[in-house]
Amino acid sequence: MKLLAFVFVFLASVYSSFAQSRPAVLMPGLGQHHHTISTKNPEAQRFFDQGLTLVFGFNHEEAERSFRRAAELDPHSAMAFWGIALALGPCINNVDLDPPHEKAAYEAEQKALSLAPDATERERAYIQALAKRYSPNANVDLRKLDADYANAMQGLFKSYPDDLDAATLYAESLMDLHPWKQWTLDGRPTEGTEEIIAVLESVLRRDPNHLGANHYYIHATESSPHPQWALASAKRLETLAPGAGHLVHMPAHTYMRVGDYAAAARSNALAADADRAYFRESNTSGSMYDMMYYCHNLHFLAASYSMAGDFAHAKQAADEVAAHAAPMLHDMPMAETYVPYPIFVLVRFHRWDDVLMLPAPKPGMAMTDAFWHFARGSAFAAKGQIAHAEAERQILATARKETPADVEFSFYFNKAQRLLDLAENILDARIAAAKGDHTQAISYWEKAVDVQDKLYYGEPPEWFYPVRESLGAALLLNGQADRAEVVFRADLEQYPRNPRSLFGLLKSLEAQNKTANVEEIRREFEVAWRNADVPLELSDP
């Protein structure tokens, strides 16, 4: 986590400077969420409500701005300062606070504590719980503070079982203990996950439109064997807060997992539009929200279009995210994660001539350079230029060996070496196939699938396409239709309605003269591929 932690330290350093660089304004399109606080100033109440809404939407810097405005309007409001401290705190996308950030949150919380005697009993409980999360000690164990806060929030939740915000924040505190790891790779809930789901479901039964509960419920279920549980939440978030780009985007996490790639693309496109409008009004381009969440929308958009077979739109989104992220690399090295996506889209659609016309990446982007060589090797193999492919493969192998074992190239904690290992196995498979050694090619495809299966969950997935598509195609082309059928069915378990695997399954059944359900599968494929702008064939895994 070394590189990831460095990135978040940088992000935290710019986070407060953006939050305090301009006064907050009341923003349109954020829904109607309300949490009554002790204040006689109606505008302070409105800014507090906006701040809490923005926390629920992971726009923490704008939330901090709103809470600070509430504190300016009512300097005696303990909950306004509680809100500042909450907004400065961690979430599943940023659990490692730097010491200055921790200090600022601690100071805001101390101010809230000093005003707490004039607050209500329930407000004091909120403030006292959050006090467990921060410390003046720069060398404090942040994970222990997170656990102490979660325990305190459990107490608040039990003391006020009808307080839906307390329940929602309690569930989030549990999620922060295992960020992006609510489920094991084999689909078992990790510690606390069942409690998270039970608490959020209890909130949604009483208030189906609760912004935070809908948001967190999608995150709590998306990597589970049951992502469809959150379909109702996804549908609600499409319209509950149209001005909150990240909340507009969130349905895509569920839609992608249930195989509705067109809906996932639509959610991300609408979210990107909402964020552009926000940047125009707020002048916050270059903020943490811009760097992380807007780029995430575009990245996810490219991935959604790619799954649906829409090359033109996938390439457009990939080019946009790479161009947007590139200027950030000096200050945010992890933004390089987005830069190779135009390369990946070309490989995904087998645009080999276009791959070979790509210029070399600029110096300083080691992973992008490695993936550029991977793409070139794949293109040369597809064209039968084996010597050139093997030369590119050697460069890729050297890059993997020279990459430190602890370096991550991921927002989801995956190691760079593992991603390069996956690329190397895929390239080996393509070179073996180009040589006519299909048995060896299948072996490499199987190794690649095994590596991909061990990647931590991320959405969109950390590797740009499901490698079982290629393994299934290789088996089918090698006359092993029965094994291909098994592989395509396994892929459809992980990527429901994946049109390429539906097509492969259809062809493998036809090759075995199996007629049961063939027409149903054909219709399902035609629906899934309806927005594609390219023909589909199995001749080039």
Outline where the language-model segments fall.
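Amphipathic alpha-helical repeat scaffolds of TPR domains
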Residues: 42-50, 77-91, 118-138, 162-183, ...
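Alpha-solenoid helical repeat scaffolds
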Residues: 48, 82-83, 168, 215-216, ...
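Residue at a conserved register position within TPR or TPR-like alpha-solenoid repeats
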Residues: 54, 88, 132, 174, ...
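Solenoid-like repeat scaffolds
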Residues: 72, 157-159, 204-206, 236-243, ...
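TPR/TPR-like (Sel1-like) alpha-helical repeat modules
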Residues: 78, 85, 89, 99-117, ...
